[in-house]
């Protein structure tokens, strides 16, 4: 009998987008797919750890809670990701994508299924920001249980406290996913205290194997 033992030093949790996904074509484009399962630094939305396996990104943090995402690529200024087209579930989340494309909101890392990153000329089809595209994909309802609950509490320095609570499940043809995220802290500088409340809800109904309604 032959016995094979294998192991790996680190989990490499960055992949590439498929050539064709749903109604989008990514063939020939510089793309990356960041898998969020079992990533470190998720409780603080720590961008340095979230993107630590993604090359050529310039990242800095202006707060210690991950309230805003500051990433840049190709030598561009990372301030509030103004040179990236930032989306959530393929929808713009910038305040004014054309006139003032700065991102004031970043979804909590615990709720993400994956992060799509497209750079180069291929990203221009999504907007005028030539740094690239960042798309946050929120988790979908779990298919294995009628009710799945996740509760996560985190304490940190500077009186930091974070609570993430999510509910997910599928009942016959009806699926749901919702979460609430609360953060508070004093910050590492004077006059930088904060409170953050995030709520998200997704409902899905399968009309058939190929047709479903969601909102």
What do the predicted segments below correspond to?
Residues 91-119:
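Short acidic/polar hinge/loop motifs at secondary-structure boundaries
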Residues 157-184, 189-215:
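Transmembrane beta-barrel wall of Gram-negative outer-membrane proteins
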Residues 39, 58-69, 127-130, 192-195:
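Short, glycine-/polar-rich solvent-exposed loops and beta-turns at beta-strand/coil boundaries
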């Amino acid at each position: 009998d032959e016995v094979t033992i294998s192991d790996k030093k680190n989990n490499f949790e960055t992949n590439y987008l498929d050539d064709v996904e749903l109604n989008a074509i990514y063939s020939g484009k510089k793309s990356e797919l960041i898998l969020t399962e079992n990533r470190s630094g998720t409780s603080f939305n720590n961008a340095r750890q979230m993107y630590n396996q993604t090359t050529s990104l310039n990242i800095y943090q202006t707060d210690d809670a991950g309230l805003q995402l500051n990433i840049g690529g190709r030598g561009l200024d990372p301030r509030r990701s103004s040179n990236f087209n930032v989306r959530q579930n393929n929808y713009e989340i910038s305040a004014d994508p054309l006139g003032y494309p700065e991102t004031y909101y970043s979804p909590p890392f615990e709720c993400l299924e994956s992060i799509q990153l497209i750079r180069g000329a291929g990203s221009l089809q999504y907007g005028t920001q030539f740094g690239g595209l960042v798309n946050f994909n929120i988790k979908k309802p779990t298919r294995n249980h009628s009710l799945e609950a996740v509760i996560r509490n985190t304490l940190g320095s500077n009186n930091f406290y974070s609570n993430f609570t999510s509910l997910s499940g599928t009942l016959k043809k009806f699926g749901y996913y919702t979460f609430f995220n609360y953060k508070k802290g004093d910050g590492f500088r004077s006059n930088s205290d904060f409170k953050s409340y995030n709520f998200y809800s997704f409902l899905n109904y399968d009309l058939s194997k190929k047709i479903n309604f969601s909102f």
